[in-house]
Amino acid sequence: MKRMAALLALLMTVLVGTLVTASPAHARSEPECESYVDVSNQAGYRVAAPIGKYGVLPCSLLWGDGGAGTVALQWALNDCYLAPAGKTLLNDDGAFGQLTFNALKFAQSKAGISADGQFGPQSRASLKFPAYTGGTYGTPTCARLGRPLP
């Protein structure tokens, strides 16, 4: 009986230790991209780029996030990846759920990076974002952030 109690105590210790030290599947290493900034260059191109609170970079977007930063990502996914491939477009609702996750994985694979469905520094540097000229929002030119536009 004492052996059974000792074994049960050991098992409970291991289980509790595992539950306490387990990390979430999508641990965030950067703050959430809560907003976006409309960046312009000298040629007159404007790009909506996700940013963290108070303009913090790098930032990340994960499943379950929502807001203006997710909207900017959805615009990029629609204009630079889904529309050119003839795929169904996302609603730009600011909700990072299954459809945004799948679209991001598609874009990441097209960009040649790890398709994990998480938007962080590598995705920000590798994915293309829509760049518009003038006062119209017609067909965009897609380019990577920090790179010269055509």
Predicted segments with their positions:
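Periplasmic OmpA-like peptidoglycan-binding domain that tethers envelope proteins to the cell wall
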Residues: 98-105
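Extracytoplasmic/secreted envelope proteins and their assembly/folding machinery
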Residues: 70-74, 101, 124
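Secretory targeting and sorting signals
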Residues: 1-27
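Acidic, Ser/Thr/Pro/Gly-enriched interdomain connector segments
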Residues: 24-94, 138-150
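Sec-exported extracytoplasmic/periplasmic mature domains
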Residues: 75-82, 105-113, 128-132
